[in-house]
Amino acid sequence: MHPPTSFRRPTSFQDLIPEDYLVLRDLVRFGVLAEDQINRRYGDSIVTMLQLPLLDAGGFVEPWEFLLCGTQLFSATAYGARAAQCGLRATKPSMQDLRHDIAVVDLADYLLEHEPEAEWRTEREASRVIRGTVRRTRRRGFENGPGHQPDGLLLKSGNVLAVELEHSVKSEQRYADICRWFASTPRVDGVRWYVDDPKIADRVARVNRQHGFDRDVDVTIEPFPPGVALRPWRRP
C-alpha cells in the first residue's frame, strides 16, 4: 500500500483524523482487523482508501501477508498503540487463533449493531471488568478452578454477559472447567455461546445441565449470526 501523492505522510499523532484513532484503538483491543472491518469503522470505503495507506506509511499499522481469502489483515504497531492510548500494548494473534479472532470481531460488530445500547470489551480487556472476583464464589460454593478469558464481554443494562464464539469441539472436561468458571464468577451475569456445530451446542448444554451451572448463571446457546463465520485461508 502506498499513500496518494497528494497526501503527506503522517509523522505525528496530530496528523490523524478522529476516525484513525477509532481504527487504531480497535486494532490494539482486538489485535487484528480485516480491511472490511476497518472500513466499517471509517464508515466510508473512500475514507478507508485514503487513510489506511497513510497509517501504514506512517508506521501506525502493520499489514499481514495475504492469508485469508478476499481481504488484507492489519495489526497496530507499538507506535500505533501509543497513539491509540487505550492502556494496552500492541499485539498480534497467533496463526492458530487468527481466523477465530477475526470472526470474533465480526460477532462483536454484529451484536453492537443490533444492540446499540450495549458496550463491548475484548478478551484483552475482560480482566479489567472481572478483576478481583477470582477467589469469590457464588452461593453453591463452586471453586473457580482453572482461569478463563472469554472471547469478549457484552455490557448491557448493568449486566456483564460473557461471550464465547466456538468453532472447534473441546472435551467435556474442558467445557466443564469453562462453565464452572462462569458459574462461580459473581461479576458474570450471563453467558452467550455462539456455535456453528450442533455437537458443540449439545456438549455445552449437557455440561451445564449435568453440573447445574445454568442454575447460577444464565446460559444461552445460539448459532453464528448472519455474516459471522471463520473465513477460509487463501490458497497458495
Task: Enumerate the language-model features and the residues they cover.
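Non-catalytic C-terminal interaction segments of nucleic acid-processing enzymes
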Residues: H2-D15, Y21-L27, E35, V169-P236
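Hydrophobic, Leu/Ile/Phe/Ala-enriched alpha-helical segments that form helix-helix packing faces
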Residues: L50-P53, L107-E115, F182, N208-H211
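A short, highly charged nucleic-acid-interacting micro-segment common to nuclease
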Residues: V28, L88-V104, A108
